[in-house]
A protein has these predicted regions:
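Ligand-binding pocket segment of bilobal, Venus flytrap-like solute-binding proteins
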Residues: 176, 183-187, 195-279
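Hinge/lid segment of periplasmic solute-binding proteins
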Residues: 51, 55-66, 83-142, 156-163
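A bilobed periplasmic-binding-protein/Venus flytrap-type ligand-binding module shared by bacterial periplasmic
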Residues: 146-153, 189-190, 291-298
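Short loop->beta-strand "edge-of-pocket" segments that line small-molecule binding or catalytic clefts
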Residues: 163-180
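Early extracytoplasmic/lumenal segment of secretory-pathway proteins
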Residues: 1-87, 91
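Extracytoplasmic/periplasmic substrate-recognition and gating elements
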Residues: 271-298
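Alpha-to-beta junction loops
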Residues: 71-79, 93-94, 170-172, 251-259
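Short helix-loop capping/hinge motifs at secondary-structure junctions, enriched
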Residues: 152-160, 192-202
């Protein structure tokens, strides 16, 4: 059996840990010796008596993944973000999970037994064409977006707003995400910064509804405004990237970068090993909550 899997980089344990990588816990220690791929192949054979070979590859962005699929790349299981899951559901790309997938009485239903209640609730409540995300997807990771910054060069106040991406003080010293969803979200936050941070807006009784409306405005005028803004920001940014900002921050090539929270933690941990402090700020205007989940392609 060949199982073709496409996932984000650094989303699974690939094994071969050194002694320096050991995680010490009160109950013992953790050291990854085997790749989770090898462990899964062995586990599958032990439980089902069949040999499975995992062909594992990584994606750079959701848009890159979608283009790969439309060009004919063939996978069995992929791990896109929620907005791409919704698109794939709407376009009938996906197989639903089995009827007993969430049955906690089944011994091997580890997901149903261990899934975060927050993720389960989110995937149950959000729907496309009347069907919940959980009918097709198993939530895997979630997080927020924000700004990783060097506190020796950037103040917390400067990093706590989306307008940092067009701040000329940091010209060619800041990175921005190279994907449609995240770059446009940051642009909207920057363009509408004054309004989103105003007391009258924040204290309005329907704040959440108004915020969602502002951040999801797809009117032609707003989209044109976003495109113009991002074109101008290109002259201020060091790069539009998907993964290189982690290294660029650690090596000091840039002083701030727009990052997903998981990458932010990794970046700060790596910098800390070199006695180099980096911080993470969530923009005051609002932030982007994301979910990545496993789905099966037809």
């Amino acid at each position: 059996i060949i199982l073709r899997v496409c996932n984000w980089e650094e989303y699974i344990d690939t094994g071969d840990w050194s002694d320096d990588d050991i995680i010490d816990l009160e109950s013992g220690s953790i050291k990854g010796e085997n790749s989770i791929i090898t462990d899964f192949e062995n586990w599958y054979y032990e439980n089902y008596g069949k040999k499975v070979k995992v062909q594992y590859s990584c994606l750079g962005t959701n848009e890159e993944l979608y283009n790969m699929l439309t060009l004919g790349d063939d996978y069995d299981v992929i791990c896109p973000s929620e907005y791409m899951i919704m698109k794939l559901m709407a376009e009938d790309w996906l197989e639903p999970v089995s009827d007993d997938f969430y049955d906690t009485s089944i011994a091997n239903n580890y997901y149903a037994k261990g899934v975060s209640p927050f993720i389960k609730k989110t995937f149950d409540e959000n729907k496309i064409n009347g069907e919940s995300w959980s009918r097709y997807a198993a939530g895997y990771m979630w997080g927020i977006t924000g700004i990783v910054y060097n506190p020796d060069k950037v103040t917390e106040k400067e990093a706590s707003t989306w307008t940092i991406i067009d701040n000329s003080k940091f010209r060619r010293q800041i990175t921005i995400k190279d994907n449609v969803r995240d770059s446009m979200f940051a642009a909207v936050g920057a363009i509408k910064s004054d309004k989103l941070k105003s007391a009258s807006f924040i204290n309005s009784p329907d704040y959440r509804e108004r915020l969602a409306e502002e951040m999801n405005d797809t009117s032609e005028a707003n989209v044109d405004r976003i495109q113009e803004y991002l074109q101008s920001v290109k002259n201020n940014a060091y790069s539009f990237e998907t993964d290189s900002a982690k290294t660029d921050m650690i090596t000091g090539k840039v002083v701030a970068g727009y990052q997903w929270s998981g990458d932010a933690v990794y970046t700060m941990d790596q910098a800390d090993e070199d006695d180099f402090q980096l911080n993470f700020a969530v923009p005051e205007e609002c932030t982007n909550l994301y979910f990545d989940g496993w789905v099966m392609l037809k």
